């Protein structure tokens, strides 16, 4: 079998309905669009218009705002850190921080810092220097004999 032998299953692809091709076709002249009016013309879709009814975006109240000072963190689980150590991508003896995790390929695009979560197990004794960590993650790191350095404000 070759690529040029491949065919669609019969009946799986319907032929396009060609409209406006003469009155004998059944869909000639107005092409199933009715007579005159906005919807019979081209480029009709009026986004958000609900036929005169008060549209949903005006029925619902405006809410909230976007905090321009909000910080976005890269979330990394302890299991992923351990997997990177096992694969030889991360050095357990060196300090684990944003740069080392990025170099190891654990995170792709660096944001405002790294936040460590407790998913998975940590066997290695590792020193972390990160922007944040969950309480459970801190407990697991200390239980494994490691240490964690957090900014004072981020300590939870």
UniProtKB/Swiss-Prot annotation:
Q: Cross-referenced InterPro entries, in alphabetical order? A: Ribosomal_uL15 (IPR030878), Ribosomal_uL15/eL18 (IPR021131), Ribosomal_uL15/eL18_sf (IPR036227), Ribosomal_uL15_bac-type (IPR005749), Ribosomal_uL15_CS (IPR001196)
What keywords were assigned to this record? Ribonucleoprotein, Ribosomal protein, RNA-binding, rRNA-binding
Where along the chain is composition biased (Gly residues)?
21-35
Please tell me whether the keyword NAD is annotated for this protein: no
Q: Where is the stretch described as Disordered?
A: 1-40
Molecular functions per Gene Ontology: rRNA binding; structural constituent of ribosome
Please name the Gene3D superfamilies in this protein's record: 3.100.10.10
| Gene Ontology biological process terms, A to Z | translation
What function is annotated for this protein?
Binds to the 23S rRNA.
Subunit structure, per the record?
Part of the 50S ribosomal subunit.
Q: Which PANTHER family match?
A: 50S RIBOSOMAL PROTEIN L15, LARGE RIBOSOMAL SUBUNIT PROTEIN UL15M
Q: What is this protein called?
A: Large ribosomal subunit protein uL15
Query: Can you name the source organism?
Result: Brucella anthropi (strain ATCC 49188 / DSM 6882 / CCUG 24695 / JCM 21032 / LMG 3331 / NBRC 15819 / NCTC 12168 / Alc 37) (Ochrobactrum anthropi)
